[in-house]
């Protein structure tokens, strides 16, 4: 399938996609604030520059886009053009995620990934369900987890 945009226009569009303070990150920030959790954002001192750091809970939350981090859900679809480029790009993102999560866990942090599909789209979690899953993870002995449109799951660094 041929892209409807020229390579220059497509490149411009992709550069315009924000990588911090996105709408889905703002939703998590509002939930954390409403529940009284203190947190820092985009902490450069930690591997992976986590989206949210909750120091009192020794917990980290990453908010991942399903496309950019290859979540196998209904929101992910590999582009039909420049497939080799996108496959390499997304593979490197996934490998980097695993490396950072492993480093954080070795340093004693609990790590949670909240996937975009949990926050937006036709199957997103309702606010109350999302809040319950976040609190469940924070209170559980689960050292790494992920929340997607289906709920809370264990996450394993391979």
Question: Can you describe what each PLM-predicted range is?
Answer:
Residues 1-113, 120-158:
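Nucleic-acid endo/exonuclease domains
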């Amino acid at each position: 399938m041929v892209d409807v945009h020229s390579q220059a226009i497509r490149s411009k569009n992709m550069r315009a996609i924000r990588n911090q303070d996105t709408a889905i990150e703002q939703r998590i920030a509002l939930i954390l604030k409403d529940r009284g959790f203190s947190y820092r954002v985009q902490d450069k001192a930690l591997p992976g520059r986590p989206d949210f750091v909750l120091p009192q809970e020794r917990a980290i939350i990453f908010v991942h886009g399903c496309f950019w981090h290859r979540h196998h859900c209904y929101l992910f679809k590999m582009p039909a053009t420049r497939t080799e480029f996108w496959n390499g790009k997304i593979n490197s993102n996934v490998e980097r995620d695993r490396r950072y999560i492993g480093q954080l866990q070795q340093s004693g942090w609990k790590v949670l990934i909240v996937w975009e599909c949990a926050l937006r789209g036709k199957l997103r979690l309702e606010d109350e369900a999302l809040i319950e899953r976040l609190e469940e993870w924070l209170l559980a002995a689960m050292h790494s987890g992920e929340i997607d449109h289906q709920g809370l799951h264990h996450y394993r660094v391979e």
